[in-house]
Amino acid sequence: MARVIHTGDTHLGYQQYHAPQRRQDFLDAFDAVITDAIDEGVDAVVHAGDLYHDRQPGLRDILDTIALLRPLQDADIPFLAVVGNHEGTRDAQWLDLFETLGLAERLDDSPRVVADTAFYGLDYVPQSKRDDHDYTVADHDADHAALVSHGLFTPFPYANWDLDAVLADATVEFDAVLLGDNHTPDTAQLGDTWVTYCGSTERASASERDPRGYNIVSFSSDATTDVAISRKSLNTREFVFVDADLGPTDGTAFIQERLRERALDDAVVVVTITGDGDTVTPAEIERFGDDRGALLTRVNDRREFDTGDDAPDVDVSFADPDDAVEQRVRDLGLDEPARDVDRIVRDDTLADAAVRERVIQRAEAVLDDDADAADDDGRPTTVEEFQ
């Protein structure tokens, strides 16, 4: 029998809300997964993509990852992973670096057998390339088979990738498909195949209200079930969600009273305003929450404001602008060069004066089909540059 931890969407390096503490929180959550794997003696840790939040993680993020994966190596627990959409590069992947160090294995179309189960990997594939993608995989002689992949698959919400078609085109029958990308954990069954999302290990957006965690997946030849999927929650940073539905005369004082009713110490506080009421200044609410011990406070005003007879309805949100932009960019279905430009413009580590030059470099590299120049930003992007 094979028993593995199925995790993903760890988003290491994400300095959410521009808070260094949140960057550490994402690392701590991944650390907790690794610790559980060793304590429980699982057969493998299977990561379904988006180990990193960005395709250019900082050196500190790389070193922290190495430090966390070494105990797994010492415990003889393999770390099996695929590449997600956030971290994918044009050339060698970060997983390739860890593989050369003996710390990870990048799953592909060849079986990686753990106990009695063969694991295969399917990296994130952009929508424009899926119709031409070859889903042929090598055969195996294990008792069970599982596919690990990253993307928004049917039959789950927000899907744009037909899993039925993938399974039909695959040359191996899978007992389970272990997925990443959707941060909401969920499980379904397509015919005889179990399909499951593990969810994220930390809250990457204010919409992720449920506890974070990972899956434990067991493969056996039991007469009742071949695949068993269970959940394990992680002890992550406390998020306090305050939903304030304002009446006609309510305003800042009403929201402050709601905050007084809650324990805010060291928490990320997310205030969502709906209803009617007076004008509320987000900065005033944020200062109030922070003064009461919150790590940080964000206000999300969902009310509609009419600024004139012919003015359109406006939905104003202050909760997580970076997350909102990322989601909008993703919804637009932009190709990789366009997503590169978006990341450059929003990179708060890049001086404003350098943005124009960096965008021009990217554009010229794409036009010349020069992938090396496209990644020429001074950071190592291949295994060879690390050696």
Curated annotation (Swiss-Prot):
UniProt KW DNA damage keyword: yes
Segments for region (Disordered): 365-387
GO BP terms in the entry: DNA repair; double-strand break repair
Class of the enzyme per the UniProt entry, highest EC level: hydrolase
Entries under SUPFAM superfamilies matching the protein: Metallo-dependent phosphatases
Binding positions for Mn(2+) 1 per the UniProt entry: 9, 11, 50, 183
Activity regulation note: Nuclease activity is regulated by Rad50.
InterPro entries: Calcineurin-like_PHP_ApaH, DNA_Repair-Maintenance_Comp, Metallo-depent_PP-like, Mre11_archaea-type, Mre11_Halo, Mre11_N
KW Iron (keyword) present: no
UniProt keyword list: DNA damage, DNA repair, Endonuclease, Exonuclease, Hydrolase, Manganese, Metal-binding, Nuclease
Gene3D superfamilies xrefs: 3.60.21.10
Binding positions (Mn(2+) 2): 50, 85, 150, 181
Knockout or disruption consequences: Mutants show a slight growth defect, but do not show increased sensitivity to ionizing radiation or alkylating agents. Show decreased rates of survival after UV-C irradiation. Display extensive delay in the repair of DNA double-strand breaks.
The EC number(s) this enzyme carries: 3.1.-.-
Note on how the cofactor is bound: Binds 2 manganese ions per subunit.
The protein's required cofactors: Mn(2+)
Annotated CDD domains: MPP_Mre11_N (cd00840)
Pfam families named among the record's database cross-references: Metallophos (PF00149)
GO terms assigned for molecular function: 3'-5' exonuclease activity; DNA binding; DNA end binding; DNA exonuclease activity; endonuclease activity; manganese ion binding; Y-form DNA binding
Active site per UniProt: 86
Acidic residues composition bias: residue spans: 366-375
Described function: Part of the Rad50/Mre11 complex, which is involved in the early steps of DNA double-strand break (DSB) repair. Mre11 binds to DSB ends and has both double-stranded 3'-5' exonuclease activity and single-stranded endonuclease activity.
Family: Belongs to the MRE11/RAD32 family.
NCBIfam families (alphabetical): Mre11_Halo
Subunit relationships: Homodimer. Forms a heterotetramer composed of two Mre11 subunits and two Rad50 subunits.
UniProt name for this protein: DNA double-strand break repair protein Mre11
Species, as recorded: Halobacterium salinarum (strain ATCC 700922 / JCM 11081 / NRC-1)
